[in-house]
Design a protein with these regions (language model features):
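Hydrophobic alpha-helical transmembrane segments
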Residues: 104, 123-124
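Amphipathic alpha-helical packing segments from all-alpha helical-bundle domains
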Residues: 78, 98, 109-119, 125-139
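Active-site oxyanion-binding pockets that recognize sulfate/phosphate
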Residues: 13, 63, 128-132
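Hydrophobic alpha-helical connector segments
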Residues: 68, 75, 81-115
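Helix-turn-helix
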Residues: 22, 30-64, 68
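N-terminal intrinsically disordered/low-complexity leader segments
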Residues: 1-18
Length: 139
């Protein structure tokens, strides 16, 4: 999803893509371990094993990092629903509800901390229309 807050160059190298993902993974881990209030650019950079300048290259601001996390969360929601819908045969209108039910049954298992991150995103950014746009579009 393209967002004015989040930028990934069209021709990004594999190293740049991996570095960007390691920053997102570090930010997610900070939220899971310490809460969203502990997330700073410096903390994300340190946890990712890079300099703050390298972090700022990929995310120009904390808000840009937050926007990327929101986008990644929305992508996670889409992939999880699709994965659970695929367990059932039939057209989408027949697999959607059973897919949701199966997803909710397994919600506490193997979600890699996404429920904690999702809760933090919803509770902290609920009134931020621009930041929450990817999630609201998913719902």
């Amino acid at each position: 999803m393209d967002s004015p807050l989040c930028f990934l160059p069209q021709m990004a190298s594999d190293k740049a893509i991996k570095t960007r993902q390691s920053i997102l993974d570090a930010a997610k881990a900070i939220i899971i371990e310490e809460g969203i209030g502990a997330l700073t650019m410096e903390r994300a950079a340190t946890k990712a094993g890079i300099s703050k300048g390298a972090c700022m290259y990929h995310f120009k601001s904390k808000r840009a990092l937050q926007a990327a996390l929101v986008e990644e969360y929305a992508a996670h929601l889409s992939s999880e629903l699709a994965r659970h819908e695929a367990l059932f045969d039939g057209p989408p209108e027949e697999t959607l509800v059973p897919g949701f039910i199966e997803w909710f049954r397994s919600f506490d298992h193997d979600n890699h901390g996404w429920s904690t991150v999702g809760l933090a995103i919803h509770s902290n950014f609920v009134h931020d229309e621009e930041l929450m746009r990817p999630v609201r579009l998913w719902y």
